[in-house]
Amino acid sequence: MKKIIKNILPPFMLFLLNKIYFVYLLNKNKLSIKKDSQDIEIYNDPITAQKLEEWGKGSVWNEIVLLLNGKKGKILDVACGTGKNILDLKVTNPEAILYGCDISQFLIDIAKNKGIDNDKLKCIDATKLDYEENFFDYSYSIGSLEHFTDEGVDQVIDKLYYVTSVASFHMMPVSKKNKNEGWTKTYQTFHNNNIDWWVSKFKKKFKTVYVVDSSWNDFISNGKWFLCYKK
């Protein structure tokens, strides 16, 4: 049905309808947001799996391929979902050893069914990563860290610093108003904060942090890559 509507309506009308629905979700969810609680159950929904197959096309999925172009060694996809990016990187980085982890066994099973090696996938909360120190050369996440609680973000960064030897790359939405708008919710809860908020988080552990524009955006956020190096 959605595809039919997209084919029938002109782009301006689609944009307007999407914006109306987006604002509706923001207002509807304001009273029900729990500050210290993540929306985890959403990851076991087939609709979520379908969205994860599509949302980064033409933007962030191209960007992670470019960022990791030519990189070798072990690379971890944090919150890998259905494994879409791992499969893309297998083509462009044939000499790399690609791993993925996700909190949802449902999504991990989909990744396994796509042919990703079982021993390279793990169902685990990213705040509890149990890989050895410097096990990976690189790690990355796309649209993931913003969904952790404030404390959870710090815990994930601590773990990624421990298990990554060279650099960790992360794409998140940041507030278009350049404000710390805090814990909010559209389809699921997330932090919609400014660039400095994220940089301060990463610099608690990583020595060097670069911020690069992403081509992704929505009605309240712009996408940014945070390139975090240990040296």
Predicted segments with their positions:
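Class I (Rossmann-like) S-adenosyl-L-methionine-dependent methyltransferase catalytic domain
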Residues: 3-74, 78-130, 148-155, 167-231
